[in-house]
Amino acid sequence: VHLTGEEKAAVTGLWGKVNVEEVGGEALGRLLVVYPWTQRFFDSFGDLSSPSAVMGNPKVKAHGKKVLNSFSDGLKNLDNLKGTFAKLSELHCDKLHVDPENFRLLGNVLVCVLARHFGKEFTPQVQAAYQKVVAGVATALAHKYH
């Protein structure tokens, strides 16, 4: 991902304020609610029968935190996203058979959740920088797909 110095500063500056547990759980939960077909990858998570069940599900929250911890690793390695996410790409492709489009959807949901959490601090410039990052992460996660 090519970010200017200003964009990198905006992304990392805001990310330092992110509660990965809260934002991760909300982002993954919203993905599962808004795009219900993504739930098929989470059969072992128990009750996903309604929006409130999804948003209150402890396994959704825990996996959302795990996802954002990986995203944090990506932010530390913006110049090597493919390398950073190679193993996760392989896992999601070969073992889990996740549709790579879901990575793009989750990235867009994450941007919306960040906007909701940070309000005016999530300026159009910050949003544009985050859109670049989530697109780069989605591309890196889809890298092992044929």
From Swiss-Prot:
Keywords, alphabetical: Acetylation, Heme, Iron, Metal-binding, Oxygen transport, Phosphoprotein, S-nitrosylation, Transport
Gene Ontology BP term (one): hydrogen peroxide catabolic process
Gene Ontology CC: blood microparticle; haptoglobin-hemoglobin complex; hemoglobin complex
Chain positions found as N6-acetyllysine: K59, K82, K144
SUPFAM superfamilies noted in UniProt: Globin-like
Modified residues (Phosphothreonine): T12
GO molecular function: haptoglobin binding; heme binding; hemoglobin alpha binding; metal ion binding; organic acid binding; oxygen binding; oxygen carrier activity; peroxidase activity
Entry binding sites for heme b: H63, H92
Domain of life the protein comes from: Eukaryota
Tissues expressing the protein: Red blood cells.
UniProt xrefs under Pfam families: Globin
InterPro entries registered for this protein in UniProt: Globin, Globin-like_sf, Globin/Proto, Hemoglobin_b, Hemoglobin_oxygen_transport
Record PTM S-nitrosocysteine, positions in chain: C93
Residue list for modification Phosphoserine: S44
Role summary: Involved in oxygen transport from the lung to the various peripheral tissues.
Extra facts: Ghost bat has two hemoglobin components in the ratio 3:2. They share identical beta-chains and differ by three replacements in the alpha chains.
UniProt similarity note: Belongs to the globin family.
Protein name: Hemoglobin subunit beta
Organism: Macroderma gigas
Name of the gene encoding the protein in the UniProt record: HBB
